[in-house]
């Protein structure tokens, strides 16, 4: 089974061009399932049946895993077996008809516009690092992209004259406008800073760390948290909260749901509708 999982993740990464975080999520879920099956004496993926999968689901529930986690694991196993079916390695999908637990979608946490502006004001210095950080924060809030998408951007994905970025995988590509403020910060970074920070001239990554290598997810998390502390913001700010705030503020200012859905890259508009509910709730509270 381990080799089958390796083949599946290679397929996701190399053929489907799935985001690295998606690949890692599938890998983590399937390795957990593989360990459970090995402990049950089943090491061959072709010998797994529906009862085995249900036993694993019960085990996750016994461990008090969240409904969303259980659903994601079932979906991972189902996708894995769809891959094996296409390869002719199995004839049936043991997770095909297993019902996903109902998951209540929680209202996302958002920052007020005042706190977002306060955060964006923090990198105000002229040092290379602060100019870069300003560009990253402005771009993240101006576009609502995911942190994995932010750090995956290449120089070729940025079009400053036409004020947009090209974002996403080949299968789910989208063009997102960046706005004047983010454009100004990016122009300053590109003109004055980036060439001093990259370690090799052929570096394609738009944003690099202080060693000149592509910025990492963990590196950017540290950056955003340091500026939140500097701003005196008590909320536990994450890059995703800026994404939530971007969406909620757009809707609050009259943007239509379909446009916001396209910018965020949501496949289902019901996900985007959550932000409208947050905005409505805020109006009621006011």
Indicate where each model-derived feature is located.
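Conserved catalytic core of the tyrosine transesterase superfamily
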Residues: 1-286
């Amino acid at each position: 089974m381990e080799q089958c999982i390796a083949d599946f993740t290679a397929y996701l990464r190399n053929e489907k061009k799935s985001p690295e975080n998606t690949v890692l999520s599938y890998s983590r879920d399937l390795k957990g399932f593989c360990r459970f099956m090995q402990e049950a004496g089943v090491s061959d993926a072709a010998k797994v049946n529906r009862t085995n999968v249900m036993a694993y689901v019960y085990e996750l529930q016994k461990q008090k895993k969240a409904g969303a986690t259980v659903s994601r694991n079932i979906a991972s196993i189902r996708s894995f077996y769809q891959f094996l079916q296409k390869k002719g390695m199995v004839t049936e999908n043991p997770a095909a008809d297993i019902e996903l637990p109902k998951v209540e979608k929680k209202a996302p946490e958002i920052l007020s516009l005042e706190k977002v502006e306060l955060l964006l004001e923090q990198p105000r210095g002229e040092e290379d690092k602060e100019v870069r950080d300003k560009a990253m924060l402005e771009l993240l809030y101006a576009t609502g992209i995911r942190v994995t998408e932010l750090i995956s951007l290449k120089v070729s994905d940025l079009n400053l004259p036409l004020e947009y970025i090209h974002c996403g995988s080949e299968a789910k590509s989208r063009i997102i406008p960046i706005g004047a403020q983010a454009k100004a910060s990016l122009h300053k970074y590109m003109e004055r800073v980036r060439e001093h920070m990259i370690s090799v001239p052929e570096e394609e990554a738009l944003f690099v760390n202080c060693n000149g290598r592509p910025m990492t997810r963990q590196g950017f998390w540290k950056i955003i948290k340091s500026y939140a502390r500097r701003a005196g913001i008590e909320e536990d700010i994450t890059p995703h909260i800026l994404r939530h705030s971007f969406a909620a503020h757009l809707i609050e200012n009259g943007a239509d749901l379909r446009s916001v859905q396209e910018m965020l890259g949501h496949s289902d508009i019901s996900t985007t509708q959550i932000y409208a509910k947050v905005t409505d709730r805020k109006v009621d509270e006011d």
